């Protein structure tokens, strides 16, 4: 009964539970496999993959903030070829039944399409998360500009959707005046779902050096501090589209996960909490049925339908 009440079905994804480690906070799964059986998870969003290898931004790239953290990693990754030859085969060999969501990033419409096409051919990749909202990449902050401009977003999403062999979920940035317009552009371009929110943009200063702590200057802010912002934006988008939303942004407990459902999410991404507690995801999964019992929630699917009806 516990298994059934946590099950989630989304385009391309039939999940035993809704808890998914967020991209950038879980590597390619190998680090956390030392702590627990990854088959406990609903899915994994692997680290962002670009066409060519990226070394990322100069250090320091991480800074602590009250109730959260800043990061300016800069999409460090080994590139598509290595991900296809090493990272995804390892996951398929060790966890053949675990559906993978591949995070795809790029610097042009053509690159997004090429990476989406290549990575979607991996048999364990069941969906793509299209990163059009990373705030830390050079090239005129191109990723952020795509996520802010509905026309650019439409073009990139359409190219990725046409190139991919699996459903495409679009990751939305909160750094926009009207997030609904970008969400609708993604929907019109053929996206199967949305993930939100990506990090806010922030910075910290070192009082001794009088300079920013991060070498990049600014970084993406995540953690519990952004949770209320995520809830508000998810609710705003859920009121205007029927696309399923994988909600993320500060989730660190079963209670927070259920709040995401009340906002309009259909599954849950867990990010920064993995750094403070490597068992964050299995802990949330274990606690979900207890918290659901406490608040009279029989199943997540029933809750999702109840919220969906209330938003109409």
UniProtKB/Swiss-Prot annotation:
Pfam families recorded: DHO_dh
Main localization of the protein described in the UniProt heading: cytoplasm
Protein's pathway: Pyrimidine metabolism; UMP biosynthesis via de novo pathway; orotate from (S)-dihydroorotate (NAD(+) route): step 1/1
Co-factor binding details: Binds 1 FMN per subunit.
Protein keywords: Cytoplasm, Flavoprotein, FMN, NAD, Oxidoreductase, Pyrimidine biosynthesis
Domain of life: Bacteria
UniProt entry tagged with the keyword Secreted: no
Entry's Gene Ontology BP terms: 'de novo' pyrimidine nucleobase biosynthetic process; 'de novo' UMP biosynthetic process
GO molecular function: dihydroorotate dehydrogenase (NAD+) activity
Annotated binding of FMN, by residue: 23, 47-48, 103, 131, 171, 197, 223, 249-250, 271-272
Gene Ontology CC: one annotated term: cytoplasm
Binding positions for substrate per the UniProt entry: 47, 71-75, 131, 198-199
KW NAD (keyword) present: yes
Cofactor(s) this protein requires: FMN
Subunit structure: Heterotetramer of 2 PyrK and 2 PyrD type B subunits.
Function: Catalyzes the conversion of dihydroorotate to orotate with NAD(+) as electron acceptor.
HAMAP family assigned: DHO_dh_type1
Annotated protein name in UniProt: Dihydroorotate dehydrogenase B (NAD(+)), catalytic subunit
């Amino acid at each position: 009964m516990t298994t059934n009440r946590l099950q989630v079905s989304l385009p391309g994804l039939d999940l035993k539970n809704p808890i998914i480690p967020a991209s950038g906070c879980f590597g390619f799964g190998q680090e956390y496999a030392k702590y627990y059986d990854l088959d406990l998870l609903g899915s994994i969003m692997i680290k962002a993959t670009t066409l060519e290898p990226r070394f990322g931004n100069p250090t320091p790239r991480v800074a602590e903030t009250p109730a959260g953290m800043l990061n300016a990693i800069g999409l460090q990754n080994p590139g598509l070829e290595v991900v296809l030859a090493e990272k995804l085969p390892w996951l398929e060999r060790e966890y053949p039944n675990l559906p993978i969501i591949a995070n795809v990033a790029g610097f042009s419409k053509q690159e997004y399409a090429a990476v989406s096409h290549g990575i979607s051919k991996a048999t364990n990749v069941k969906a793509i998360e299209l990163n059009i909202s990373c705030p830390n990449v050079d090239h005129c902050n191109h990723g952020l500009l795509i996520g802010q401009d509905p026309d650019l977003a439409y073009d990139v999403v359409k190219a990725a959707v046409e190139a991919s062999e699996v459903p495409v979920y679009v990751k939305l940035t909160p750094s926009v005046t009207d997030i609904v317009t970008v969400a609708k552009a993604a929907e019109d371009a053929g996206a199967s779902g949305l993930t939100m929110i990506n990090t806010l943009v922030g910075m910290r200063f070192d009082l001794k050096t009088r300079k920013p702590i991060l070498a990049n200057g600014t970084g993406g802010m995540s953690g519990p501090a952004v949770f209320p912002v995520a809830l508000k934006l998810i609710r705003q988008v859920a009121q205007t589209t029927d696309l399923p939303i994988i909600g993320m942004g500060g989730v660190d407990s079963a209670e927070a996960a259920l709040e995401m459902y009340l906002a309009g999410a259909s599954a849950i991404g867990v990010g920064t909490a993995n750094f403070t507690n490597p068992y964050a995801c299995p802990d949330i999964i274990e606690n979900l049925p207890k918290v659901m019992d406490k608040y009279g929630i029989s199943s997540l699917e029933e809750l999702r339908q109840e919220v969906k009806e209330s938003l109409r």
